[in-house]
Every structure is written in C-alpha cells, then in structure tokens.
Amino acid sequence: MLQRVRKLSLLRELLESGAAGGLLLMACAVLALFVANSPLAEGYFHALHVPFAGLDLLHWINDGLMAIFFLFVGLEIKREFLDGQLSTWANRALPCIAAAGGVVVPGLIYASLNAGSPETLRGWAIPTATDIAFALGVLSLLGSRVPTSLKIFLATLAIVDDLVAVLIIAVFYTAELNTAALMGAALVTLVLLGFNRLKVKRLAPYLVMGVALWWLVLLSGVHATIAGVVLAMTIPLHASKAAPDDATSPLHRLEHALSPWVAFLVVPIFGFANAGLSFAGMTPSVLAEPVTLGVALGLFFGKQIGVFGAAWLAIRLGVARLPVAASWAQLYGVSLLCGIGFTMSLFIGLLAFRDAALQNEVKVGVLVGSLSSALIGATLLSLTKRRLPAVDPSRDHQADATALDDLGREDAR
C-alpha cells in the first residue's frame, strides 16, 4: 500500500513538474515575441549571434543545451518502454497507434501544400511533433476536469512522438557526413555499451564519454542532439528484485537530476531564443505562404484528425481501449492539444531551413497552429465534464468502482 501511494505521488509530481515547465515555456515564448517587437529587438537579435568558442550563442543553445533536452527525452523513452506505461502492449497500444496517426496526417497535409517546391517540402516533419511541456501546461489549467488517465495518455503519446521525431531528425536532417568523426562516435558508443554490459552504476564515466560523443557527433554532420539520445540508451536502468529502489538506478538518478533543469532552464531558454519573431515589414500575406499554411494546418487539423482518427479506429477494432473514466469528447479535446508543436516543431524547422524568411514562416505557422490547438482544445475540455450524463447509481455504481480500480492500477505502474 505504501509503495502504491509512493508511485502515485511520483506520477503526480512528474505531471505537475511538466505542467509548471510548460507554463514557464509559454511565458518565455510570449516574452520573446514582446522583446522581438520592442526597442530591445536589436540587442536581442545581436546577443543571439555573439560568437563564443567557434559557435554563436544561438548555435550553443540549439546544438548544446538541446542535447541535454534530448538526453532527458531519451531517458524518458527508455524508462517508459522498459519499466513504465509503454512496457506492455496493452498500455502502449493506444498512444503508439494514436502517435502514428498524429505523425502521418500532419506530414501529408504539409506535403500536399508544398509538393511543388523541393526546397519547402523539406519541412514536412515540422507539424508532426507534440510539445509535452506546453500541452501538460495547458492541461494543468483545467485541473480535475481532465481524468488522470488522459493525462497519462497525452504524456505517453508525446514520448512516442519524441521518439519518432528523433528518428526523423537522424534520417532526414543529416548533413554531409564526416566519416572519421562518425567512426569516432561509433567507438565512443561501443565504450558506453561496454560500461552498460559491465553494470557500471557510477554516472561520471557515462557523462565524460557523453561529452566526447557530443563533440564527435557535432563534427560528423549528424545533428549533435542525437548524441543525447544515444547516451541515454546506454545508461543502465538496472531495475531488479535485488535493487528495487529507484535510487539505485543510474537512469532514474540522472532523469531525476535533469528534470528541473530541463523544465525550468533548458526548454525555456530554447523557447526564448527561438520564438522571437519580428513582425516588422511582415504583411498578412505571410499567412497564405505554403510553409505557413502547411505547418499551421498540419498542427491544427492534421494532429486532431490523425490522433483522434487512429485512436477511434483502434478502439473500435478492439486493439486498444478508451482511457479509464474518459469520454470520447475528452479524448477529442486531448487530440486537439496534440497540435501544440512548439519546441520540437521549431527545432525541426531550424534544421529544415537555413533561409531566414522560411524560418519566420515556420514560426508563424507554429504559433498559429499551436495557439489555435491550445485555445480550442482547452475550451472543449473545460466544457466536456458538464456535458457528461448524470450518474445513475443503480446502473453505474459497479462500472465506476471498476474504472476507479483500473485507474489506480494504471497509476501505480
């Protein structure tokens, strides 16, 4: 019983931490827009391009700080698949299928609007991402109107989404390769895997080799953030009956240590550095540009159609089940929130395009699509509870008891 309460408390802490980080990210994005369109704009854009150790500040943020973000994402992915909500097919079916729909449909919408231009078609993956921090931040504003099972569904779907985004970045957004650096990175990876096989539990050796891996990957032409994911995959989970306490696990220790830094420093800094969009000289015609339309419509329409459509089909076919204590309307509302692409969408946009004008179109599309998804999704979810039918004790008592018991079991995992 005590262990169950502890696990529920940890889950609640995780959700609350993600929500708080999402709210801070929103604030930083708004602040960046304000600064970029104020008398401070010149200093803001100049500071981002101040050179330091061979790279400007913006590159250090996008290639360096974001490697820490991807390390954290990789740790989450590994933990969830080995020892979390995604460790069994029964739990992973719905978020995995929904995530697949949420990648395919937005990508197709973007591609259909940019099919005539090979240059802009490179951005097809921009609307395929979901920002877990931003989405959980919006959910936190709704309080108890959204059942815990749907919050878990959104969090696990976003983790699968991140895994797909990592694969997309590695496969489709890799520059010309430096073979020597790539071989060096492979050698360092083998050393890290050796640490894992030898059950090395101290984090220091992994982190030292991780820095070397990051530098070699940066030189190789593969985006440097991939080093964070590779490092995460080698950190041992070591969950065993002999050492069941999370404190004995290097993966849990590192994830717990990184969590506040990622939520309250890394992601907000990225948002502040990359969301700054100057509207000076911009006309309403930018909203009709294929890149802007592809990103905005992909996030807003593509995500909700893909996520909800795939989830509906999976549930109707009996492959998955509707989250406990959730209604179809609530599932649709959460599907809308999946259109909040922000962090990962902006990041992929920077990889897809070097042209400043195209990057600005990406930012406009991400802002329009993400804000529309957030506002309409939150509005729908705030109304759905009132629309639910009244409980009939003679009819629903047993079903409700079973649902609550199932929810407790899911939370305890």
UniProtKB/Swiss-Prot annotation:
Biological processes annotated in GO: regulation of pH
Reaction it catalyzes: Na(+)(in) + 2 H(+)(out) = Na(+)(out) + 2 H(+)(in)
InterPro entries listed in its UniProt record: Na/H_antiporter_dom_sf, NhaA
Sequence intervals crossing the membrane: 15-35, 57-77, 93-113, 123-143, 152-172, 175-195, 211-231, 261-281, 295-315, 333-353, 364-384
Transport found in the keyword field: yes
Molecular-function GO terms, alphabetical: sodium:proton antiporter activity
Keyword list, A-Z: Antiport, Cell inner membrane, Cell membrane, Ion transport, Membrane, Sodium, Sodium transport, Transmembrane, Transmembrane helix, Transport
Magnesium in keyword set: no
Bilayer disposition of the protein: Multi-pass membrane protein
Task performed by this protein: Na(+)/H(+) antiporter that extrudes sodium in exchange for external protons.
PANTHER family associated with the record: NA(+)_H(+) ANTIPORTER NHAA, SODIUM ION/PROTON ANTIPORTER NHAA-RELATED
Family as reported in the entry's similarity comment: Belongs to the NhaA Na(+)/H(+) (TC 2.A.33) antiporter family.
HAMAP family linked to this entry: NhaA (MF_01844)
Protein name: Na(+)/H(+) antiporter NhaA
Organism encoding this protein: Caulobacter vibrioides (strain ATCC 19089 / CIP 103742 / CB 15) (Caulobacter crescentus)
